[in-house]
Amino acid sequence: MAKIYVDGKAYCMSESDNLLQACLSSGLNIPYFCWHPILGSLGACRQCAVTQYNSSLDNQGKLIMSCMTPVIDGTIISINDDTSKKFRSNIVELLLTNHPHDCPVCEEGGNCHLQDMTVMTTHNFRNYRFSKRTHKNQYLGSFIKHEMNRCIGCYRCVRYYRDYADGTDLDVYGANNNIYFGRIEHGVLENEHSGNLIEICPTGVFTDKTHSKKYNRKWDMQYAPGICQNCSIGCNISIGERYGEIRRIENRYHESINHYLICDLGRFGYSHTNLKNRPKKPILSTKENDVNILNFNKAIEYATNFFQRYKNVIGVGSIRSSIENNFALQELVGKENFCNGMSDKENSCIKLILDTLKNNQLYIPSLKEIESYDTILILGEDLTQTAPRIALAVRQAMKNKAKDLAELYGIPKWNAAPISQISEIYKNYLYIFNTHETKLDNIADWSYFSSIDNQVRFARAIAYELDKNLPDISFLDSNLRKKASLIAKKIISSKKVLIISGSHVYSKSIIQASINIAISINQKNINHVGLTFVTSSSNTLGLGILGGFSIENALKKLKNREAEAIIFMEYDLYRYISKHDCDVLFKKNDNIMSIDHQYTQTYKNSGFALPSVNFTESSGTIVNFEGRAQRFFQVYDPMFYDKKNCLYVSWKWLSFIKSKIEKKEISWINLDNIISEYSDKYPIFKKIKTAGPNASFRVHGQKIARSPHRSSGRTALRANINIHEPSQPKDADTMFSFSMEGYSQPNKSISHIPFAWFPGWNSPQAWNKFQKEIGRQLISGDSGVHLFKSNKKILDIYFHFSPKKFIKEKYWYVIPYYHIFGNEELTQYSSIIKQNIPLEYVLISELDGLELGLKKNSIVEFNCLNQDFRLPIRLSKHLTSKHIGLPIGRKGFPISLIGEKVKSLWEVMS
């Protein structure tokens, strides 16, 4: 630590930071534009000027750019001297020369870094009286609105998009005072993290188009700290609501997970929560297919009779639902009748992953820690599509070699320009094993494209090269053996090695192979090894801990009359099982019950159905890919806006039914009650109570406010329904209040922050004030709690199996392919996401296409699982012959297709 004197006061600052970052970490305010914690320093905007003095006797000093100045012990600077203040005010005035006077109509207003910095520099009068240069705006897709006339030329957008996220279709054009940031031509931004431009840009050049359609100022929305439900990463998000609709999702800072960035699916994939056509009241279908709407009491009475009428009711849980909901279902039907809803293949994969997390000492890194590895192997996962934020972390890991080299030459890590140039030449090592092309191939040292079986064989060869005690690999051809040896040598010479695998290809063998490589590295005891498993949904691991049998076993029990009825909780059977088998089951539906917040095919076909609430309308806990339990919180009460609705979180419905059956008082009054019960019954959940404060938590006797203190129009929220203002809803489950009344400032006790605001800091840059140091941990520490402990003893138990060589057959073998938009279940109901879902197609190899005389977009037909398919084809250079890729997870493409065999496919002439 260095001692720095600022305006006559001494501060201890980190010598690894630049002066701007160090001052901000110390709570001092220096205006800035081009600098950003994840982008480093460029010195382009000249806004962060301060005066530096040679000694205490120096009265003149010199202006320096604090973002480009290292922290050196004994440095004397002034932020508030007249020279610095006047210079910074003049810079703002120059930057505003061509900026329009449109704050009242600008969507960034009240959430704008430019506004904050203009106020901070006390600039309030413009001397420029001439014409402003104007630009034409571009169409950038359905997510982002472009308003180029607001640009101040800070270069943040291209530095993030091109240098950080590796996007290629956004650049800077022009020169001098006439530069343009955009695409070569109109078109959708191609990068999966393009939405972060909205928060990276300090002005209103890039704004949220989904928010524009129903716009509210930041201070007029109600917020809650949420967890993204779209993949297994568990990114922290801030969810904003107004008039009973989710209006916006922003990144919520978490040092160990998403940091400052989230993917586009997490940011824009929320409109399914606002659907008007959603279940709102309990329904009962009659034999004549009539639908009767029930009130609350009738619904509970019928549900009670349902469980009394049928013996051994199977309860099907859901990977997209919270631990609380799944536990409540398990308690109602009993452990022996609890189905986790996963397929046989996924169930075995998740059991293996959980056993590894529970029993092994292999290190499971956080998302942020992934960036620190210098060699990464990805086995079987197309990360850009299945876990985009991890893919972005892998890209940063590849660039970190440049930072290490820069350090050798005395270049600090925050100096962006030279490091960016070095990273073009020197990168860390990345090896990818997949069935077909991925978007990370462009940064990989080598990509191995082959069948799953062949990937497992090659992974086994690498493990053998690391530990010769393993069985010989004579089965592998000489070229692949040489490649395996080369990769093993790179691994041995690395400081930190990461193996990434997962369950998306539904292969237990490939997970075992990845574990074997990690163990063989660990045996060397010369370098650090990490292991990351990507799973299919937000709470796959949480549900896996509760146990239960697969969906195939559940249907088998029904068929064999070992069970008489079934209840689906937030689960669509049509996503997992063929349409033919589902239709057979639903022919007689009076023994089928469903609880959900979407009109899924399962919900529609059930004999009795209860409407639940989605994740924005409820609070609960989920477990992410690293075994971190995280709490998400209710944003608003949907029944506040319409008392006629009968909407409850699933665990409350199940609690009402359970108490009625047992003729007892309701045991789970609030969220704390049910958390306490399952944490007692499952020792692994013992620490989960600390994942978030309980409902009685207060700061200075106050609950935490969900709304900013400037929130307006509360008395008019329901005036169109009733002019009499009702009292605000009471939240018995959490420490938050449904209003602006309550605590909202940085505090050592609060890590679940609904929204980022601090006096003078209205934009997302306000997160600076909630951190111990800029870009590092929150004042209160990271939220969430790790459920698994790592053992210190070295693991030496390998998985022994004989991977089969893929033999070309006369049948076609079905494999999955994924797209970021369209494979996750709930976002397929989102209107804005539907516009961005690629058309469905069949993926086959170019070799097979040539053999069959097929070209791109030729229409083919085939039959699988008693279902006919008719789709255009796409040709892959790398896909193994006789493999057929299908968009698993899309409507009409159930998970049960994976691994099935197709006898033949034929072209349909149009």
Curated annotation (Swiss-Prot):
<feature type="binding site">
    <location>
        <position position="151"/>
    </location>
    <ligand>
        <name>[4Fe-4S] cluster 2</name>
    </ligand>
</feature>
<feature type="binding site">
    <location>
        <position position="106"/>
    </location>
    <ligand>
        <name>[4Fe-4S] cluster 1</name>
    </ligand>
</feature>
<feature type="binding site">
    <location>
        <position position="154"/>
    </location>
    <ligand>
        <name>[4Fe-4S] cluster 2</name>
    </ligand>
</feature>
<dbReference type="InterPro" id="IPR036010">
    <property type="entry name" value="2Fe-2S_ferredoxin-like_sf"/>
</dbReference>
<dbReference type="Pfam" id="PF10588">
    <property type="entry name" value="NADH-G_4Fe-4S_3"/>
</dbReference>
<dbReference type="Pfam" id="PF13510">
    <property type="entry name" value="Fer2_4"/>
</dbReference>
<comment type="function">
    <text>NDH-1 shuttles electrons from NADH, via FMN and iron-sulfur (Fe-S) centers, to quinones in the respiratory chain. Couples the redox reaction to proton translocation (for every two electrons transferred, four hydrogen ions are translocated across the cytoplasmic membrane), and thus conserves the redox energy in a proton gradient.</text>
</comment>
<feature type="binding site">
    <location>
        <position position="45"/>
    </location>
    <ligand>
        <name>[2Fe-2S] cluster</name>
    </ligand>
</feature>
<feature type="binding site">
    <location>
        <position position="99"/>
    </location>
    <ligand>
        <name>[4Fe-4S] cluster 1</name>
    </ligand>
</feature>
<feature type="binding site">
    <location>
        <position position="34"/>
    </location>
    <ligand>
        <name>[2Fe-2S] cluster</name>
    </ligand>
</feature>
<feature type="binding site">
    <location>
        <position position="228"/>
    </location>
    <ligand>
        <name>[4Fe-4S] cluster 3</name>
    </ligand>
</feature>
<feature type="domain" description="4Fe-4S Mo/W bis-MGD-type">
    <location>
        <begin position="221"/>
        <end position="277"/>
    </location>
</feature>
<comment type="subunit">
    <text>Composed of 13 different subunits. Subunits NuoCD, E, F, and G constitute the peripheral sector of the complex.</text>
</comment>
<dbReference type="InterPro" id="IPR010228">
    <property type="entry name" value="NADH_UbQ_OxRdtase_Gsu"/>
</dbReference>
<dbReference type="GO" id="GO:0046872">
    <property type="term" value="F:metal ion binding"/>
</dbReference>
<feature type="binding site">
    <location>
        <position position="201"/>
    </location>
    <ligand>
        <name>[4Fe-4S] cluster 2</name>
    </ligand>
</feature>
<keyword id="KW-0001">2Fe-2S</keyword>
<dbReference type="GO" id="GO:0042773">
    <property type="term" value="P:ATP synthesis coupled electron transport"/>
</dbReference>
<feature type="domain" description="4Fe-4S His(Cys)3-ligated-type">
    <location>
        <begin position="83"/>
        <end position="122"/>
    </location>
</feature>
<dbReference type="InterPro" id="IPR019574">
    <property type="entry name" value="NADH_UbQ_OxRdtase_Gsu_4Fe4S-bd"/>
</dbReference>
<feature type="binding site">
    <location>
        <position position="235"/>
    </location>
    <ligand>
        <name>[4Fe-4S] cluster 3</name>
    </ligand>
</feature>
<dbReference type="GO" id="GO:0008137">
    <property type="term" value="F:NADH dehydrogenase (ubiquinone) activity"/>
</dbReference>
<keyword id="KW-0479">Metal-binding</keyword>
<feature type="binding site">
    <location>
        <position position="157"/>
    </location>
    <ligand>
        <name>[4Fe-4S] cluster 2</name>
    </ligand>
</feature>
<feature type="domain" description="2Fe-2S ferredoxin-type">
    <location>
        <begin position="1"/>
        <end position="83"/>
    </location>
</feature>
<dbReference type="GO" id="GO:0048038">
    <property type="term" value="F:quinone binding"/>
</dbReference>
<dbReference type="InterPro" id="IPR001041">
    <property type="entry name" value="2Fe-2S_ferredoxin-type"/>
</dbReference>
<keyword id="KW-1278">Translocase</keyword>
<feature type="binding site">
    <location>
        <position position="231"/>
    </location>
    <ligand>
        <name>[4Fe-4S] cluster 3</name>
    </ligand>
</feature>
<dbReference type="Pfam" id="PF00384">
    <property type="entry name" value="Molybdopterin"/>
</dbReference>
<feature type="binding site">
    <location>
        <position position="48"/>
    </location>
    <ligand>
        <name>[2Fe-2S] cluster</name>
    </ligand>
</feature>
<keyword id="KW-0411">Iron-sulfur</keyword>
<keyword id="KW-0408">Iron</keyword>
<protein>
    <recommendedName>
        <fullName>NADH-quinone oxidoreductase subunit G</fullName>
        <ecNumber>7.1.1.-</ecNumber>
    </recommendedName>
</protein>
<feature type="binding site">
    <location>
        <position position="67"/>
    </location>
    <ligand>
        <name>[2Fe-2S] cluster</name>
    </ligand>
</feature>
<dbReference type="Pfam" id="PF04879">
    <property type="entry name" value="Molybdop_Fe4S4"/>
</dbReference>
<dbReference type="InterPro" id="IPR054351">
    <property type="entry name" value="NADH_UbQ_OxRdtase_ferredoxin"/>
</dbReference>
<dbReference type="InterPro" id="IPR006963">
    <property type="entry name" value="Mopterin_OxRdtase_4Fe-4S_dom"/>
</dbReference>
<feature type="binding site">
    <location>
        <position position="263"/>
    </location>
    <ligand>
        <name>[4Fe-4S] cluster 3</name>
    </ligand>
</feature>
<dbReference type="InterPro" id="IPR006656">
    <property type="entry name" value="Mopterin_OxRdtase"/>
</dbReference>
<dbReference type="Pfam" id="PF22117">
    <property type="entry name" value="Fer4_Nqo3"/>
</dbReference>
<feature type="binding site">
    <location>
        <position position="103"/>
    </location>
    <ligand>
        <name>[4Fe-4S] cluster 1</name>
    </ligand>
</feature>
